[in-house]
């Protein structure tokens, strides 16, 4: 079984972390940063899950985003990427979604037992989009 969380809500991950599943599951948590210029992914395989290492990995990036988006009154209405007032474009969300599907699929195919956490950033050169690059990768277990 695969559980995919796209809420970007720590309380959802906390619920998953406090649950002791009877069967093995793969859990994928996928979220984007403000403006959808970064993608945060963590994947785990097991029946108990711990997101503390993931929180520690993404925390500096989230803090940096708050500084970049000081002009926004946070938290604000429409905080999710699904909302029309989210400060990111739909094509940025599509790129993040497509990347996430590929990462999740590769993780499942590999039958990995390790926790995999990734941070992607959009790369541009001279104002031209080039790619999504992995800027942080951690494997545990």
Sequence positions of predicted segments:
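Receiver (REC) domain switch-region micro-motif
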Residues: 3
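Glycine-rich phosphate/adenylate-binding loop
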Residues: 6-141
